[in-house]
Amino acid sequence: MQSLEIVAIVELVVAAIIAIVVWTIVFIEYRKILRQRKIDRLIDRIREREEDNGNESEGDQEELSALVEMGHHAPWNVDDL
């Protein structure tokens, strides 16, 4: 019975480690999705303001460039040359 208890404890520890790893990956991907949504909203605002008046979107462009410079790469930046 003692070996069965040890195996059960080991299985619980392994299951807990796997759960932590999986939820960490889910959290990281969720943050990526939120950042991408923020970038998409900024792009939409820039496009809308360009249609109205080209000079009003400078603040949004600065915010977008700050996001991209922080490592949040936008999908339209392709450096495969």
UniProtKB/Swiss-Prot annotation:
Disulfide bonds: none
Protein name in UniProt: Protein Vpu
Annotated positions of the Phosphoserine modification: S57
Swiss-Prot/TrEMBL GO biological process terms: receptor catabolic process; symbiont-mediated suppression of host innate immune response; symbiont-mediated suppression of host type I interferon-mediated signaling pathway; symbiont-mediated-mediated suppression of host tetherin activity; viral release from host cell
Domain of life per record: Viruses
Family: Belongs to the HIV-1 VPU protein family.
More details: HIV-1 lineages are divided in three main groups, M (for Major), O (for Outlier), and N (for New, or Non-M, Non-O). The vast majority of strains found worldwide belong to the group M. Group O seems to be endemic to and largely confined to Cameroon and neighboring countries in West Central Africa, where these viruses represent a small minority of HIV-1 strains. The group N is represented by a limited number of isolates from Cameroonian persons. The group M is further subdivided in 9 clades or subtypes (A to D, F to H, J and K).
Domain commentary: The N-terminus and transmembrane domains are required for self-oligomerization and proper virion budding, whereas the cytoplasmic domain is required for CD4 degradation. The cytoplasmic domain is composed of 2 amphipathic alpha helix that form a U-shape.
Quaternary assembly: Homopentamer. Interacts with host CD4 and BRTC; these interactions induce proteasomal degradation of CD4. Interacts with host BST2; this interaction leads to the degradation of host BST2. Interacts with host FBXW11. Interacts with host AP1M1; this interaction plays a role in the mistrafficking and subsequent degradation of host BST2. Interacts with host RANBP2; this interaction allows Vpu to down-regulate host BLM sumoylation.
Documented activity regulation: Ion channel activity is inhibited by hexamethylene amiloride in vitro.
Transmembrane domains' residue ranges: 8-28
Region spans: Disordered: 50-81
Biased composition (Acidic residues): 53-63
GO cellular component: host cell membrane; membrane
GO MF annotation list: CD4 receptor binding; monoatomic cation channel activity
Extracellular topology ranges: 1-7
Membrane topology note: Single-pass type I membrane protein
Post-translational modification: Phosphorylated by host CK2. This phosphorylation is necessary for interaction with human BTRC and degradation of CD4.
Main location as per UniProt: host cell
Alphabetically ordered keywords of this record: AIDS, Apoptosis, Host membrane, Host-virus interaction, Inhibition of host innate immune response by virus, Inhibition of host tetherin by virus, Ion channel, Ion transport, Membrane, Phosphoprotein, Transmembrane, Transmembrane helix, Transport, Viral immunoevasion
Listed InterPro entries: Vpu, Vpu_cyt_dom_sf
Described function: Enhances virion budding by targeting host CD4 and Tetherin/BST2 to proteasome degradation. Degradation of CD4 prevents any unwanted premature interactions between viral Env and its host receptor CD4 in the endoplasmic reticulum. Degradation of antiretroviral protein Tetherin/BST2 is important for virion budding, as BST2 tethers new viral particles to the host cell membrane. Mechanistically, Vpu bridges either CD4 or BST2 to BTRC, a substrate recognition subunit of the Skp1/Cullin/F-box protein E3 ubiquitin ligase, induces their ubiquitination and subsequent proteasomal degradation.
Cellular compartments annotated: Host membrane
